[in-house]
Design a protein with these regions (language model features):
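Flexible loop/hinge segments that line or gate small-molecule binding clefts
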Residues: 106-143, 251-259
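Hydrophobic alpha-helical segments within soluble ligand-binding/sensing domains
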Residues: 136-162, 250-254, 269-287
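Hinge/cleft segment of the Venus flytrap/periplasmic-binding protein
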Residues: 273-322
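Periplasmic-binding protein-like
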Residues: 39, 93-101, 119-123, 166-168, ...
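An alpha-beta-alpha
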Residues: 57, 148-191, 290-310
Length: 322
């Protein structure tokens, strides 16, 4: 009997030591001197719309003593492409991932599976129709659309009777575009305006979409940076046939079209803040196994030619132009 009790005590002691060793190993890995590696997976990284994003990464990496690896491939067009790249980076030793998700339901489920391996933060956009369950840092897309429409109403003194509007985006199925569109429609309800068409570059029919072939409208509203830049170039070339441009964007080209008078209003999300906060959340998770990452909402600014170079917008323009 005594022998059995002694054996039990020894087993308990050994298990206790093992638990201490495992916890010690976890703490060592999370708080050791080697910096964490964060893989950042985004499309078209050389586009200027990512300038503020990349500058935010640089500053956050310096602040948190973190190695940041940016992965961008021209052929990354589907969620499966994105997942494959993420798996490769995790296999190479990435401790966490920041990703701009390619929105579809299959990709959503695969990202949730990957999050069991390493912490993942989605930036800028999530998934349509239902909550993704992923941690996200993004602006309030609905209110961005609503504020864009509100500026339009202000400029027309609340009277849009007889005015025809065209809405242009790159990905009509993304949650960001869906929410922005709803914000616009809710705000313009009862204004007298008619939305004559709403088209996106990416569509099920694979038909090539361009603004010049759309029915003529009085106002074009572009719901993302690429669409705004394309519409700005069309306005510059008189291919909008006199339509005025309002939209959402965050690149030097977008600011140029506003400053030059080819657009009336630009709503610009703070991409610097988005990625900086993403790194901060991931580092907190890496340093504390029990930390629960938080979704965060970043700010945005309604820019016009009148306030574009004001003191309060200096930092935003600085990060966009980096």
């Amino acid at each position: 009997m005594k022998h059995g009790k002694k054996t039990f005590v020894i087993i308990e002691a050994v298990l206790g030591i093992l638990v201490i060793l495992v916890l010690g190993f976890i703490i060592y890995k999370q708080n050791g001197h080697d910096p964490e590696t964060i893989a950042v997976i985004i499309p078209d990284v050389d586009e200027s719309e990512w300038s503020a994003f990349k500058y935010g990464l640089k500053m956050a990496a310096r602040e948190y003593d973190t190695d940041v690896v940016i992965i961008s491939k021209d052929n990354m067009e589907t969620a499966n492409d994105e997942i494959e790249i993420m798996n490769q980076e995790i296999a190479k030793g990435a401790d966490a991932v920041i990703v701009k998700p390619i929105a579809n339901r299959d990709g959503q489920q695969k990202l949730k599976q990957l999050e069991k391996s390493v912490p993942i933060m989605a930036v800028g956009d999530t998934f349509p129709e239902e909550p993704s369950g992923l941690h996200t840092i993004e602006p309030d897309h609905y209110h961005m659309g609503a504020d864009l429409a509100q500026k339009l109403l202000e400029n027309y003194r609340g009277n849009l009777i007889g005015k025809k509007i065209g809405i242009y985006s790159q990905h009509a199925t993304s949650e960001a575009v869906i929410k922005r569109m709803k914000g616009i429609c809710d705000t313009l309800k009862g204004s007298g305006a008619e939305i004559l068409w709403s088209v996106s570059k990416e569509n099920d029919s694979k038909e090539k979409i361009n603004l010049q072939t759309q029915r003529r409208v009085d106002i074009v509203m572009a719901l993302d940076n690429a669409s705004f830049v394309e519409a700005g170039e069309a306005a510059k070339d008189n291919d909008l046939y006199g339509a005025v441009l309002y939209g959402i964007g965050n690149s030097t080209e977008a600011v140029y079209y506003l400053d030059a008078g080819w657009a009336q209003c630009l709503v610009a999300p703070d991409e610097f803040d988005a990625v900086y906060e993403s790194v901060a959340e991931l580092i907190k998770k890496r340093h504390n196994f029990f930390y629960k990452m938080k979704d965060r909402q970043i700010t945005y600014t309604v820019l016009t030619r009148e306030n574009l170079f004001s003191e309060e917008n200096r930092n935003l323009l600085f990060t966009i132009s980096r």
